Amino acid sequence: MTSPSSSFWNTASREAMKSGMFVAKVYCFLHVTTNYLGFMAYAYGPSMIPTLHPSGNMLLAERISKRYQKPSRGDIVVIRSPENPNKTPIKRVVGVEGDCISFVIDPVKSDESQTIVVPKGHVFVQGDYTHNSRDSRNFGPVPYGLIQGRVLWRVWPFQDFGPLGPTPT
């Protein structure tokens, strides 16, 4: 025969276990989704004007294509910064492996240009607003391994909600 207090504790422990399992399932779902399928990225600053607003954008990026195909010219990608791994800038791919890229090193200060060949396993990324962008002109070509995902959609600001596909460069 069970006492009323032990019945209460049995019921409470069962409910706690159910709740704990639900929380664990939600956490696992979110972990798999954000680490393997897609994620939300926040972009702010002037480096991608006119494509992105300098005051801030919420973007939907996917991680699947980086596993099965190489980035293409014109793709907007989220990268892990080669200079500061805590930052994830958003830039446009302007050159893929084997491309010969000529660029002005610092368009604000001079018109000195440089030409490089993008090495195998790398991409050359650049902000759309080259006068105010820290990109491959500063830190060199980016290895594929630092690409976190490809941007698909702008989610916020809502009036500009929609796809952000590649544009010719």
Curated annotation (Swiss-Prot):
UniProt keyword annotation of Hydrolase present: yes
Q: Which domain of life is it from?
A: Eukaryota
Write out the catalytic residues in the record.
47, 91
First-tier enzyme category under EC: hydrolase
Q: Name one GO biological process term.
A: signal peptide processing
Report the GO molecular function annotations.
serine-type endopeptidase activity
Subcellular location, record wording: Mitochondrion inner membrane
Kindly state which keywords UniProt assigns to this record, in alphabetical order.
Hydrolase, Membrane, Mitochondrion, Mitochondrion inner membrane
First-listed, main subcellular location of the protein, grouped into a coarse class: mitochondrion
Per the record's keyword annotation, is Hydrolase included, yes or no? yes
What Gene Ontology cellular component terms go with this record? mitochondrial inner membrane; mitochondrion
Q: What is its EC number?
A: 3.4.21.-
Could you say which protein family the record assigns here?
Belongs to the peptidase S26 family. IMP1 subfamily.
Its biological purpose is as follows:
Catalyzes the removal of transit peptides required for the targeting of proteins from the mitochondrial matrix, across the inner membrane, into the inter-membrane space.
Listed NCBIfam families: sigpep_I_bact
- Identification of the protein by name: Mitochondrial ATP-independent inner membrane protease subunit 1b
Organism, scientific name = Arabidopsis thaliana (Mouse-ear cress)
